[in-house]
Swiss-Prot record:
Biased composition (Acidic residues): 168-182
Protein name in UniProt: Protein pxr1
One Pfam assignment: G-patch
Localization per Swiss-Prot or TrEMBL: Nucleus, Nucleolus
Organism per entry: Botryotinia fuckeliana (strain B05.10)
Comp. bias (Low complexity): 313-324
G-patch domain location: 25-79
Example GO biological process: rRNA processing
Length: 368
């Protein structure tokens, strides 16, 4: 914000390095230690103690307190380098400075390789701990060449020792001729024994190679037998699966045929039921029609009788030309129901209206 920013005034103390307490000789602790025989510059602790030899200048210096003002764990190091606060690209910068100072490329590459090896070792030790590779001997091999060579060297050393012993014995026993004659015999026997050992070793090597070849052949034969047995098992499984499938197909076919037969039977039964229902309905309709015909015939006869009764008053009214309404007397019988009865009633009403003069005059709007 510039000049408009809030101003924070900081006043420096008289002891910015905080060394007054360390230089103060009037404190209670300083005076107590002096009274006990301590002098400035000496180490803390008993001089005759068992661990006095491990005291260093750190025992005489002040204890430095570091305030933890971060969220890192105890002992955590800031930065991704090897040391505390080391930059990651510092080694590249050092190589560049070395080239400017006139160092050779071989020296720079050697230093870079050493730094990389150190980083790898530190990373491996942090992740997996210290690793030590110990030779445990030869585990698998057709020929144990190292052991054979070691045995040969051991036999050579034994021969050299035997020759030295023989020469010393010949010098000591030069006075007696009998001992001189006997002395070469054990040497020859020893030479023969060494040759026999070599021959036995060669035979053992040959037998071991033959055994290894036989074992390989046996392994191959076992593998081929296993493969053949597996193929046979697979064939048997496939045949069993095919037979199971054929059985399932047969069962499904038989089920489908039985279901079709059941369906045909069900359809025939349904058709018979439908026919029976239709016949019942027809019979009911015929009975209802007969009833309606009887009712209509009775209604017609009653209406005819009513018309005959009402003829005499209608003729008298025409002579006098007086319009008087005709009231139909109820017969007291139940009217027939149905479509035909309603139509018959409508026709009867039309006939009655045509026979009545007053109603005709009203229809044709003729004033009497």
């Amino acid at each position: 914000m510039g000049l408009a920013a809030p101003k924070n005034k900081i006043k420096l103390s008289h002891d910015p390095n905080n060394t007054r307490w360390s230089g103060n000789t009037d404190s209670f602790g300083h005076r107590m230690m002096k009274s006990q025989g301590w002098t400035p510059g000496e180490y803390l602790g008993a001089k005759d103690a068992a661990h006095a030899e491990f005291h260093t200048e750190a025992n005489a210096s002040h204890i430095r307190v570091v305030i933890k003002d971060n969220t890192l764990g105890l002992g955590a190091k800031i930065g991704s380098g090897v040391g505390h606060g080391e930059c990651t690209g510092l080694d590249v910068f050092q190589n560049l400075l070395g080239r400017l100072n006139g160092k050779e490329e071989a020296e720079i590459e050697k230093e870079q390789k050493g730094r990389e090896d150190l980083k790898r070792a530190i990373y491996a030790e942090r992740k997996w701990g210290s690793i030590r590779f110990v030779k445990g001997g030869v585990l698998i091999g057709d020929k144990i060449q190292d052991l054979i060579d070691g045995e040969k060297e051991r036999l050579k050393a034994l021969e050299i020792k035997e020759k030295a012993a023989e020469s010393s014995s010949e010098e000591s026993d030069s006075s007696s001729d009998e001992e001189e004659e006997k002395s070469p015999e054990p040497v020859a026997e020893k030479k023969k024994s060494s040759k026999r050992k070599r021959e036995e070793q060669e035979d053992e090597e040959k037998t071991s190679s033959k055994k290894s070849k036989k074992e390989k052949k046996e392994k191959k034969e076992k593998k081929s037998k296993k493969r053949q047995s597996e193929d046979e098992d697979e064939k048997d499984k496939s045949e069993s699966k095919k037979s199971k499938k054929s059985k399932k197909d047969r069962k499904s076919k038989s089920k489908s045929t039985s279901e079709a037969e059941d369906e045909t039977l069900d359809e025939s039964a349904l058709k018979a039921r439908k026919k029976e229902k239709k016949e019942k309905k027809r019979k009911e309709k015929e009975a209802a029609g007969a009833d309606t015909e009887e009712a209509s015939s009775t209604s017609k006869s009653s209406k005819k009788s009513k018309k005959d009764k009402h003829k005499s008053p209608s003729t008298s009214k025409t002579s006098t030309k007086e319009s008087t309404p005709i009231v139909s007397e109820s017969s007291g019988r139940s009217t027939p129901m149905g479509i035909r009865s309603i139509r018959a009633r409508h026709i009867a009403q039309k006939r009655m209206a045509s026979m009545d003069v007053a109603s005709l005059n009203q229809i044709f709007m003729i004033k009497s």
